[in-house]
Each structure stands twice: as C-alpha cells, then as structure tokens.
Amino acid sequence: RFLVGISIDGPRELHDACRTDAAGKGTFDRVMKSLTLLKKHKVNFNILCTVNAVNGDHPLEVYRFFRDEVKAQFIQFIPVVERDHQSGTLTPLSVSPEQYGKFLIGVFDEWVKHDVGTTYIQHFDTALANWYGEQHGICVFSPTCGSAMVIEHNGDIYSCDHFVDRDHL
C-alpha cells in the first residue's frame, strides 16, 4: 500500500507564487486536477506543503484550504531553508525561524480546537505520539533514519523523505 505525496503550497495565489513550470506558469491547476483524479480512484494522498517566505505569513488560509477545499486527511508542513551556493546566506524563498514557528502555532491552534483525530498533521501527531510514549513515523524524532521510502517522479529512490537530494540518492 502506498501513500501518494502531493506537493501543493496552499491556495492558487500562494502556490503559484513559488511553484511554476519551465515556461514560468503556475502549476496549481495541474495539481488540483491530479488531486481530483486521486480522489476519483480512492487513492490515499498526503499533502506536502513547503512553508516558505510567501505562504509562511498565512497559516490559517493554507490550513483551511487543505482541510476545507482539498479535504486532505494527511498534511506535512516542511520548512524551506535554502542556502545560496556561493554566499551561504539564506535565499529569499526561505522561511525564517520566527515565521515558521508562528505558522505552526497558527495551524496548531486551529487544529487542536477542531481537527484532532480527523486531520493528521505529521509534526503534531509525532509530538503527541512521543508524549504518550507511542511509536512515531518521522525520522527526525527517531534514533535512526530510513523507514519511509520515497520514489520520485523521475524514478530516483531515497530511504527517507526528509533527505531527498543528490547527496542521499
């Protein structure tokens, strides 16, 4: 059994601000079409939302879009932290630590009031599992890594979905 990861960063204006194709056009419509197809065929999917400098100031808009419009049951919020190869400084797309923290707090406050047990957000579920002494499925909270195999669209295979880059191929 597989869980398909769909990369989408929120509603159209937030997603298309950072996710464009080779022609510079936003990919929102294609992603939504793919989601419709997955739902039609009852394929389980997980939202992979990169939190960046653009959508990082809109936690409730992003979360409510996934919950209410996409009807996502599983969501991951992954911070964008990119460094310029020459200078080593963070790129303008990177989310600041403060911005990412406020984003997670905004989502958590909404989630804990309304959606615990119906919407699964990886960081929050992992924290709760740890608190209860239960097993969790995220390697950054585990003694070892490699329990979540990833197959990318181009066929590349990784042993962890948190280290999907050439150094870990």
Where are these regions (language model features)?
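Radical SAM/AdoMet-radical enzyme domain recognition
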Residues: 1-80
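Active-site-proximal loop/short-helix segments
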Residues: 81-85
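A C-terminal junction/extension of Radical SAM enzymes
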Residues: 86-167
